[in-house]
From Swiss-Prot:
Catalytic activity: a plastoquinone + NADH + (n+1) H(+)(in) = a plastoquinol + NAD(+) + n H(+)(out); a plastoquinone + NADPH + (n+1) H(+)(in) = a plastoquinol + NADP(+) + n H(+)(out)
InterPro entries in the cross-refs: NdhO
Family: Belongs to the complex I NdhO subunit family.
Pfam families: NdhO
Primary location class: plastid
HAMAP family from the UniProt entry: NDH1_NDH1O
Protein name: NAD(P)H-quinone oxidoreductase subunit O, organellar chromatophore
Protein source organism: Paulinella chromatophora
Gene, per the UniProt record: ndhO
Coiled-coil positions: none
A GO cellular component annotation in the UniProt record: organellar chromatophore thylakoid membrane
Subunit-structure text: NDH-1 can be composed of about 15 different subunits; different subcomplexes with different compositions have been identified which probably have different functions.
Superkingdom per UniProt: Eukaryota
Length: 82
């Protein structure tokens, strides 16, 4: 299993709970290739980091029936229930 560091220097590994960092996502290539208004659940989390490949991670969302999605690992941050 691969382990990557995000821009916030938080090490993420498979099966960690994650959410998308809004500042890193908005205006990114992934955001431009998606819906103009991103769904709130990606910023609220939690999602499970399933696997990584290169600079991307596959995330599975928990709260709604949504397809798994590949996102840049640098756009992810650890989920906390704060």
């Amino acid at each position: 299993m691969n382990e990557f560091q995000t821009e916030s220097f938080v090490s993420l590994k498979p099966y960690d709970l994650v959410k998308v960092n809004r500042g890193a996502y908005v205006g990114s290539l992934e955001a431009r290739a998606s819906d103009p208004i991103p769904p709130a659940y990606i910023f609220e989390g939690p999602g499970t980091l399933i696997t990584t490949a290169g600079q991307y991670s596959l995330v599975r969302w928990h709260l709604i029936p949504a397809p798994d999605v590949w996102l840049a690992t640098a756009q992810l941050e650890a989920y906390s229930e704060d």
